[in-house]
């Protein structure tokens, strides 16, 4: 077993300074960091889905740092913070981008969160990932918003008009959204509606991964594609096929690469951590198999020194050996 230490680094290209760059480079050397993954358009800096021009602003700010890191023997990776989008966050899709948003199980339509089968969104996302690949990152990550469930405050997706047409074609009859959802959730033996929903959810995400993988490796053949994962029970709701999904993402000649959720954004009792580690991290590792490259995500929230002790952080790192 070997370890690679990746620093997931948040910065704002609009307010970045040479002094901040110097702090980054000094920290990387002091902490013996192997790889820096630049988070693009992340957290409070997020301003909806980026256009080509907006994306280039981030890449232009990263490229000089990439060159300086390379002189230190440190690789550069990219972590765009959104695919579908975690939640609307007060934004709407830029008309220049113009894809359709998803509709949840209750008929609520998102303002900024993509329909995962929308052809315009699929083309848009593949183009953006090809653009990210243009700087030849070591790894190119997809976020855990690449899922059908947990897009606050909306519920399970997608039941837009386009999806309803797909479902009805497979049913060979017309059903309203309400009727389809009611039958899909009916207790007892799984209904044909449930099978149709899960088959479509599973299929469209694998197709999306394949489109992105092709776009990336056409530009940067040596880049590994990786994906952050959420709780396995969330992914079970959409019928995730872990093997096919991650093989589609990896592409020929590349490993399955994942960033499993590592429990505890705040310090908790070791017993609680252990249970969640088994439930989330260890289960994810089992789904991905013994040859996958795993980069468990160690993160603190909120971002202050008071959230965790150094001892607890060291404890978390040690537990990753169990994966």
Regions found by a protein language model. Give the residues of each.
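Hydrophobic targeting/anchoring helices
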Residues: 31-32, 39-40, 138, 149-150, ...
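The substrate-binding groove and active-site-proximal loops of carbohydrate-active enzymes
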Residues: 5-16, 43-59, 107-124, 189-207, ...
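Conserved, mostly hydrophobic/aromatic
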Residues: 125, 132, 140, 216, ...
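Aromatic-lined carbohydrate-binding/catalytic grooves of carbohydrate-active enzymes
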Residues: 24-61, 84-108, 149-152, 156-158, ...
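Active-site-adjacent "subsite" loops/lids of carbohydrate-active enzymes
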Residues: 75-135, 144, 148-150, 163, ...
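N-terminal structural segment of carbohydrate-active enzymes
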Residues: 1-40, 74
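Aromatic-lined carbohydrate-recognition surfaces of secreted/lumenal glycan-active proteins
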Residues: 3-14, 75-85, 140-145, 194-240, ...
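Well-ordered, non-membrane alpha-helical segments in soluble/globular domains
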Residues: 17-26, 52-65, 121-126, 201-213, ...
């Amino acid at each position: 077993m070997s370890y690679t230490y990746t620093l997931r680094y948040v910065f704002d290209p609009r307010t970045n300074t040479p002094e901040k760059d110097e702090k980054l480079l000094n920290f990387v050397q002091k902490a013996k960091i192997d790889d820096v993954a630049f988070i693009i358009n992340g957290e409070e800096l997020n301003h909806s889905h980026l256009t080509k021009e907006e994306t280039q602003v981030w890449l232009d700010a990263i490229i000089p740092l990439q060159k300086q890191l390379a002189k230190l023997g440190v690789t550069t990776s990219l972590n765009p913070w959104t695919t579908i989008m975690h939640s609307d966050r007060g934004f709407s899709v830029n008309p220049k981008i113009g894809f359709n948003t998803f509709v949840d199980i209750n008929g609520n339509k998102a303002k900024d969160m993509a329909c995962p089968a929308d052809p315009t969104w699929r083309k848009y996302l593949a183009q953006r990932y090809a653009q990210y690949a243009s700087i030849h990152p070591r790894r190119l990550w997809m976020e855990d918003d690449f899922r059908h469930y947990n897009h606050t405050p909306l519920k399970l997706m997608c039941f837009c008009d386009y999806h309803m047409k797909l479902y009805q074609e497979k049913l060979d009859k017309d059903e309203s959204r309400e009727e389809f959802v009611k039958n899909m959730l009916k207790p007892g033996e799984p209904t044909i509606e449930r099978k149709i929903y899960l088959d479509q959810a599973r299929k469209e995400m694998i197709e999306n991964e394949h489109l992105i993988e092709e776009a990336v490796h056409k530009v940067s053949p040596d880049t590994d594609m990786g994906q952050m994962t959420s709780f396995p029970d969330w992914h079970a709701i959409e019928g995730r096929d872990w093997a096919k999904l991650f093989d589609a993402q990896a592409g020929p000649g590349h490993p399955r690469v994942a960033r499993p959720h590592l429990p505890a954004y705040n310090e908790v009792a070791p017993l609680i951590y252990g249970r969640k580690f088994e439930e989330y991290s260890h289960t994810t590792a089992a789904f991905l198999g013994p040859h996958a490259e795993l980069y468990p995500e160690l993160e603190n929230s909120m971002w202050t020194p008071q959230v965790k002790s150094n001892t607890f952080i060291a404890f978390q790192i040690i537990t990753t050996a169990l994966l």
